[in-house]
């Protein structure tokens, strides 16, 4: 409930009558301040008038005043700049580490708002705010989708950069591992990443021109040679094993994975790990899995053709473009401060058609436009980072839902008015 009190303060859903401190001084909120999600006071740089005197500083919010002491703020100098303490229950006075008494305001969450917030949290429906979506302005919806897409790209680029850092700035290796992980298409993603990290690109590079040797190396390191061939291909399986044994001895390689590590159940034949590893081998052999090759492509169609040549279906190719190529380009551009790469990544998503899955079909049924991969990636981000975490208070859709509650409470003769028109993350 404290999060909801933050929401009420941030968006100035304040009493219709005069707001006053616990000792009777009139309070007027000029600026609620900037919400702080890190350590320290909840709102920075707020401005309030207390009995006509302007106070500029920080605001701290608790359900009870005694929480101030329970959290140790009375002995923490980081809270000495607090000029107003907002609480639902003023059960004691509060002071700073310098023994300065802090004015307090009792602020209640409007009943209609609290009820609708509880409905959002406890409904089994998805999305919880579905009935408000059709009435939202296209401008607000599109603005929120743009921010969600940027958030998702930054998050996925961060995952790429973590690999780059882990590999000592080696973009080529980070590219290979990122690509291989996404060839797991979810179910085998973690295992593919483990496998890719075991591959010696130095060893593979010495035999890149020979596809048979690359396949033998890749399948052998995956522990899958004995499961990658049909019974009538026993001779080929034996030669592949012999080739891998030769390469493993030459480069002192030891397989760390075995068949049991891979998931075959509930996997379609085209997604069997050994099938995907052969496709990766063909990409590596042709040079299309290299970072330079991805950076120097000129169109989505060209990328489609390059990846398709490795035996990927059109839908699998699109997923690799969305989940591998776009994040790599975005990460590369962000790390170098070059927008041409980040723009190319987002342009690629806007050009590619949206994925087709259950989550996106539900959003479509709610009236949202889902035509490109940019749209679908934004809505996947919304589902994973907001809906699944019940983080409705930071969501534009949740904001619109709860704002209607505040307005309804006012119309019904309630005690609140919402004067704020900013978005929940601003």
Regions found by a protein language model. Give the residues of each.
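N-terminal ordered "arm"
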Residues: 7-66, 79
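Short, low-complexity, charge-dense intrinsically disordered segments
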Residues: 416-426
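Catalytic micro-motifs at enzyme active sites that drive phosphoryl/nucleotidyl and oxygen chemistry
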Residues: 32-37, 45-50, 67-75, 90-96, ...
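Acidic, carboxylate-rich catalytic segments that either coordinate divalent cations
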Residues: 365-408
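Internal, well-ordered alpha/beta segment that forms a basic, Gly-enriched binding/recognition surface
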Residues: 86-204
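Hydrophobic, aromatic-lined core segments that form the binding pocket/scaffold
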Residues: 148-378, 391
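Elongated alpha-helical scaffolds
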Residues: 77-88
């Amino acid at each position: 409930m404290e999060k909801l009190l933050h929401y009420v303060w941030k968006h100035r859903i304040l009493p219709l009558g005069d707001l006053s401190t616990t000792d009777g001084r009139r309070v007027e909120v000029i600026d609620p301040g900037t919400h702080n999600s890190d350590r320290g006071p909840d709102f920075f740089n707020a401005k309030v008038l207390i009995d006509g005197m302007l106070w500029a500083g920080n605001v701290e919010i608790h359900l009870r005043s005694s929480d101030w002491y329970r959290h140790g703020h009375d002995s923490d100098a980081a809270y000495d700049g607090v000029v107003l303490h907002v609480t639902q229950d003023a059960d004691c006075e509060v002071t700073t580490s310098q023994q300065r008494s802090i004015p307090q305001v009792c602020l209640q969450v409007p009943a209609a708002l609290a009820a609708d917030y509880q409905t959002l949290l406890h409904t089994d429906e998805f999305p919880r705010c579905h009935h408000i979506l059709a009435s939202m302005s296209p401008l607000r919806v599109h603005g929120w989708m743009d921010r969600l897409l940027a958030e998702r790209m930054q998050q996925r680029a961060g995952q790429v950069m973590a690999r780059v850092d882990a590999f000592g700035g080696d973009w080529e290796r980070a590219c290979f591992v990122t690509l291989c992980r996404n060839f797991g298409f979810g179910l085998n993603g973690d295992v593919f990443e483990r496998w890719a990290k075991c591959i010696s690109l130095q060893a593979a590079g010495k035999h890149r021109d020979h596809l048979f040797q690359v396949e033998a190396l890749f399948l052998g390191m995956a522990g899958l040679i004995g499961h990658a061939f049909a019974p009538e291909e026993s001779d080929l399986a034996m030669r592949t094993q012999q080739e891998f044994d030769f390469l493993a001895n030459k480069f002192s390689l030891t397989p760390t994975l075995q068949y049991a590590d891979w998931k075959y159940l509930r996997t379609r034949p085209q997604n069997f790990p050994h099938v995907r590893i052969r496709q990766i081998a063909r990409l590596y052999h042709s040079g299309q899995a290299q970072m330079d090759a991805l950076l120097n492509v000129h169109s989505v169609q060209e990328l489609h053709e390059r990846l398709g040549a490795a035996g990927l279906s059109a839908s699998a190719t699109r997923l690799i473009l969305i989940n591998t190529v776009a994040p790599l380009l975005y990460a590369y551009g962000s790390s170098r401060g070059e927008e041409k790469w980040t723009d190319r990544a987002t342009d690629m998503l806007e050009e590619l058609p949206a994925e087709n899955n259950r989550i996106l079909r539900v959003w479509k049924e709610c009236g949202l436009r889902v035509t490109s991969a940019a749209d679908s990636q934004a809505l996947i981000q919304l589902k994973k980072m907001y809906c699944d975490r019940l983080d409705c208070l930071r969501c534009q859709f949740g904001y619109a839902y709860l704002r209607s509650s505040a307005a309804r409470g006012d119309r019904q003769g309630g005690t609140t008015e919402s004067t704020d028109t900013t978005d929940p993350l601003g």
